[in-house]
Amino acid sequence: MGLYKKVNRNEKRLIRHKRIRKKVFGTAERPRLCVYKSLKYIYAQIIDDEKGHTLVAASSLEPEIKSRLTSTKSIEAAQYIGRVIAERAKEKGITKVVFDRGGYPYHGRVKALADAAREAGLEF
């Protein structure tokens, strides 16, 4: 049989994510805005990699956010999560972040979340 193993989409994403994570590092002054999306929900967290702490988090799985959304996996949900994460970051005094797209293409829900966070006041 063949020498090459077929690599599925998620494995390719994880390879891209590892490659990106070598370059993207969050500090206390400029923490990392990390995005994860599943088939049902979208998650965003702001992480200080020096300490290994999550400073702020938001997801479409949270009951108060989920109740306001018609769908938890739509672009509108991603935009709402982007606005929420930016508001929570401002409350903690965070204005500048490094964007970590998690190996996902910068398109669709990931782009919508990033654009909404920028509009709400986060700088990348």
Swiss-Prot record:
One of its GO terms (cellular component) is cytosolic large ribosomal subunit. Keywords: Ribonucleoprotein, Ribosomal protein, RNA-binding, rRNA-binding. Belongs to the universal ribosomal protein uL18 family. GO terms for biological process: translation. SUPFAM superfamilies: Translational machinery components. This is Large ribosomal subunit protein uL18. HAMAP family: Ribosomal_uL18_B (MF_01337_B). GO terms for molecular function: 5S rRNA binding; structural constituent of ribosome. PANTHER family: 39S RIBOSOMAL PROTEIN L18, MITOCHONDRIAL, LARGE RIBOSOMAL SUBUNIT PROTEIN UL18M. InterPro entries: Ribosomal_uL18_bac-type, Ribosomal_uL18_bac/euk. This is one of the proteins that bind and probably mediate the attachment of the 5S RNA into the large ribosomal subunit, where it forms part of the central protuberance. Pfam families: Ribosomal_L18p (PF00861). Gene3D superfamilies: 3.30.420.100.
